[in-house]
Amino acid sequence: MITKRNIPCKKNWKYKKKSISLTLITICYMFLFLTSCKPGKQNSINLLLLLLNTLDNKNVNEKIEDSTNTDPSSNVNEEDENSINANANDNAPSDSDSSNPRSPDKNPVNPTSPNSSSADIGIKILSHSIFMAPTNLSSWGDLGQEERAQRIASSSYIKNQDIIVFEGLSHNNAEKILLEKIRSEYPYQTNVVGRTKKGWNATLGAYTTSPMANGGVIIVSKWPIEEKVQYIFNNSNCGQDQYYNKGFAYVKINKDGKKFHVIGTQLQAREPDCFNSGETIRKLQLNDIKSFIDSKDIPKDETVLITGDLNIIKGSNEYFDMISKLNVNEPRYVGVPFTLDTKTNALAAYYYEKEKPIYLDYILVSKLHAQPPVWQNLAYDPISNTTWKRSDGYTSYEFSDRYPVYGFIYADSSTPTKSGHKRKYDQVSFQSTFNRKFIQADHNKKDGWLKADTRIKTDFTKFNLLQENVSESNPSCMNSGSVRIESSYYLNYYWNWFIGAASGDYGYYTKFNNGSDSLGIKNLDNGCLKDGSRVAFYDWDTIGGGYYYLTVWDKGSWKEHLFLWVQSFLSSREIFYLHLDSNPPKDWSKDLIYHH
């Protein structure tokens, strides 16, 4: 009974002591705060800190002594989060005192965990299928391969990357031009997949020397490549792909001591000659990739990236099968909505005119290996600063039929935030001063008649202007002179005039890859073409000779059609207002994730 009476007495005294100590501490802190603004305060502050330290040590000792379940030896180096000393240290200035570093995170991320996110992991990778088939395959022929290689090499969109994977680079001269010109920035380079066994640490799969073309995949890097393996797919490709040594390149890259494993590939193309558009073959090729990754026994704390032209439509059943088969996470998609876009990319529209826009290119991260905190895929639509020409005169500013894709953790100042495909003189419209109606292409036929017959702007009233004799693809100022006028809705369909045995001679329509060579635009207000400029169009009559102006026909069944008719005098039927497109380029800056 005596013991029971003594225990509560002891506790009450203990709490009283604590209450007194806390009261003294509070008073000291208030005094410390009040003196902090006065001159000659340092001696007072030192005295108070000494008192606080004494009180704190006393409290800590009492805690240890009074605990019935504490092993004193286990608490010698343990920090008490609620101790006065800990709070005092946190409140004291630390940026100028290296002797008092902040305590480490009590729950650090395990960098070896497959699902961990390491703050210091960082890689920037670009994938681009650049459509450079060899000329010995007659179905492709001249694609401006060497001209485009020159422009890609000097472009800004390939700058500031750690790694680039090129696909579709099977043209030998174009390959030499491109790789040599970017060697100073990307000195570590693989050979192209499927051409030779030289330069590889290993060649696996069904390599053969008989195909007409190599596999077209090349990886270049800013950082040392420690291992290079080429793998040729173990299945028979179909359609055009049967002539290629298709497979993938594997590289192990050392970036400042960190290892990154990259697989770059171009899977079976989506061809109508193939059973189910080649899906069965692509599944087998994905199996080859997954089996190879498994066989490498890559450490779980190293990043594995699978990238390239996978020819699998985003959002399709095949896409989700791919995500599952490769055991990868879906990236965060930003940028333009398609990588093969027949509505915006003239080269894609030229060769795949009947295809709808689709997304086919990816940079994916293996789930079984190191995981970044976030992984973004940005599809971007750059154009060349200068135009290029094919041997037949076809002129373009596209780098490829595909748009490139960037893979990265966090966006930075070099990350594209807006569409690069918006030229100043794209999607312009022309309004007749005669009837106040806009010129438009036919709604039902790509090669239909041009008419000034609508008061409403639509996709059919928009046209792209290009002066083929000017090398600059996107001039800030376009003057009077020869011009190619292309329907913005029907890419590669240009203004031309008709001549034949039927009615409609000298009437204008849009014709595939065949614009009038002598068509010109005249700015009646002089200077640069700008919004609201009054313009007239002229062309050469190859039948009767001489230049004539285009006019809006004003009667009969051909009313409101455009004809090459007036030779000298300009009336309201020959004059049009030019309207520039005021819509801003697509902006995805708010969709990007930046590191804060």
Swiss-Prot record:
Q: Is Nucleotide-binding among this UniProt entry's keywords?
A: no
Q: Where would one find the signal peptide in this protein?
A: 1-36
Please note every region of biased composition (Low complexity). Answer: 83-118
* Subcellular location, principal: secreted
Highest taxon in the source lineage: Bacteria
Enumerate the Pfam families for this protein.
Answer: Exo_endo_phos (PF03372)
Record CDD domains:
nSMase (cd09078)
The UniProt entry, under SUPFAM superfamilies, shows:
DNase I-like
User: Which stretches are annotated as coiled coil?
Assistant: none
Q: Name one GO molecular function term.
A: sphingomyelin phosphodiesterase activity
Enzyme Commission number: 3.1.4.12
Q: Where is this region: Disordered?
A: 63-118
Q: Where in the cell is it found?
A: Secreted
This protein is called what?
Sphingomyelinase C 1
Q: Which organism is it from?
A: Leptospira interrogans serogroup Icterohaemorrhagiae serovar copenhageni (strain Fiocruz L1-130)
Q: Which gene holds the coding sequence for this protein? A: sph1
